[in-house]
Amino acid sequence: MRLEDFNYVLPKELIAQQPAEPRDSCRLLMVDKKTGEWQHRRFGDILDEIRPGDVFVFNNTKVIPARLFGRRKETGGRVEALLLTPKGNDVWEILVNPGRKALPGQEIEFSENFSCTVIDKTEFGGRLVKFHYSGDFDNWLDQLGEMPTPPYIHKKLENKDEYQTVYAKFKGSAAAPTAGLHFTPELLEKMKDKGAELLFVTLHVGIGTFRPVAEENIEDHEMHREWYTIEKETAQKVNEAKEEGRRIIAVGTTSVRTLESAGQTGRVEAGSSWTQLYIYPGYQWQVVDAIVTNFHLPESTLIMMMASFAGREHILAAYEEAVRQKYRFFSFGDAMFLR
């Protein structure tokens, strides 16, 4: 299939610059994956769709304030760094802007007592660096770092928690699993009262999630790697639900990717691993029965995933309807429920 097959026209004013308040007051486009028929609702109305025994799977990764601003020690030139992946012993893979001059041996200072030294280059233009600091690394990030919001969000966050799910637990993401931003503690309790089972997996979202597809033939695209963990009890509960014919509802594309990566045999396997799973039309779904998701960028791997799940024509028609009805798009935007 061609990249242009997943394009749609989006007016810039529909790109949400801040989250809905309260979180579950955003709009919800419910789409039947078999017929393509839709309904316009509010996110809190998802309670009306819950069947007793439904299993909702959330990604409990926590976004770190991974964007740092510093200067090159030798020249004083300004540098922006984005932390991607911890490698152990204070070594991280990062992106550096401007990166051309970030050569091995160069030192970047973010504060008087917090700096890093470039060790090597990595794939996709990254750098391997070792941090030098006194005290606690996380405290330095909290003090100096900014939340790495996507490039299409131009408004500065009023509060770091705006870009964090209410159930975020394990630090490690360079971007939020944004479908989860719509859930409030009160809504989660009401879901349990309706008979839903809430489970959690962890996938640390990498900056590769924003990397555009450059290949015209989508099959030629190389998917980025992300690290996920599924606990033994979670895997058992998902497998039991599948055996009993209960729905597995993934909250967000990262939960989808985790479940499908661990479920390639038809049963979800517990453990931790890297995944490069690339889901596009033609993929054989193994685990997920329904998806709560946001509206994704044109020609992105995420809209391809949705097209694989519900059909390209159904997805593009739903997106066109969302544009007509002036839904809010992308990370802070409104949501879809594909079921």
Write out the residue ranges for each language-model feature.
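Surface-exposed, charge/polar-rich loops and edge strands
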Residues: 1-339
